[in-house]
Amino acid sequence: MASMKRKCPDDETACGSGAGAAMCVTGCGFFGSEATNNMCSRCYREHSADNDAVEEAAAANSDLELVGVAETTTKKARMSAVVPVAVASSSSAAAEQPAAKAATAPNRCAACRKKVGLTGFKCRCGGNFCGGHRHADAHGCGFDYKSAGKEQIAKQNPLVVADKLATRI
C-alpha cells in the first residue's frame, strides 16, 4: 500500500493537486480553476465587475445617443420659446442673490457685535443677539410685548356675543 502513494514534485505545493489546479493567470499567487477562467476567486470577481461596468457604460451610452437624437429635434422646435424665458429667469435670479446674502449676513450680536453663529437668539424686534443680550431689557428692545400678547389672546379666544333681538327688550 505504501507503494501506491504518489510522490510530490518540487514545483507543486501540495500532494494530490490534480490537473484542474493551476496558478492564477494574473500572477497573484493563488490557485485558479477552469470554472473561473484559470483565475482565483478574487481576480475573477474583479474581472467580472470590470466587464459589467464596461457593459453598463456601453448600454447607457447607446441609450443616451438615442435620447440625444430625439432631444435635438425637439430642442430645435422649442428654441425660440425657451430663449426669452431663460433671459427673464436669469435677471430674476440676479436680483435674488443680494437678498440671499443679506439674509445670511447677521452672524453677530446686534448689541456687542460678538460672533454668535448658530447659537444666536433672534428677537421679535428683528435683531440677532448673543446669550448676554438675548433678553429684551438687556438690549433695549423696542418691541411692545404687552400689546402683542393682548392681540394674540384676542385671536385665540374670540368673544361670543349674541345678536340683539328687536322684539325683545
From Swiss-Prot:
Family annotation (SUPFAM superfamilies): AN1-like Zinc finger (SSF118310), Glucocorticoid receptor-like (DNA-binding domain) (SSF57716)
Gene Ontology terms for molecular function: DNA binding; zinc ion binding
Keyword Amino-acid biosynthesis appears in the UniProt entry: no
Protein residues bound to Zn(2+) 1: 24, 28, 40, 43
Renumbered zinc finger spans (AN1-type): 103-149
Signal peptide region: none
Disulfide bonds: none
Function summary: May be involved in environmental stress response.
Protein name: Zinc finger A20 and AN1 domain-containing stress-associated protein 7
Native species: Oryza sativa subsp. japonica
Organism taxonomic ancestry: Eukaryota, Viridiplantae, Streptophyta, Embryophyta, Tracheophyta
